[in-house]
Amino acid sequence: MSKFGELINFEVPILLDFFGDLDESSKSMHPVLRDVAAALGDRGKVIKINVDLNSELSEALRIKDLPTLMIYKGGEMVWRQSGEQDAKILINLINDFV
């Protein structure tokens, strides 16, 4: 979990995608997140976290539905939503925190 603290402690916004390999909604978010990362460039980061490989972290953050997306800035969670999201909405949200 100390690695998680390092992961989210950036001044640029960090979009975390908690996903499952077998979850269809998670799979459909892959191209969306690729578009978000491309649009952000160095103004933000997109990080995918597999809940099956990170069960302790998933439990600590109470991840119940997939995908679950979170935006962190400066070590603080500033936004959280479960379910599929649109790339334009995510880009606009992240730009609000740049």
Predicted regions and their residues:
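Thiol-based oxidoreductase modules, predominantly thioredoxin-like and allied folds used
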Residues: 18-20, 34-37, 41-56
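Structural motif corresponding to alpha-helix initiation and N-cap regions
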Residues: 1, 51-54, 87
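Non-catalytic, surface beta->alpha helical segment in thiol-disulfide oxidoreductase systems
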Residues: 73-98
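Chalcogenol-based redox active-site neighborhoods
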Residues: 28, 60-61, 92
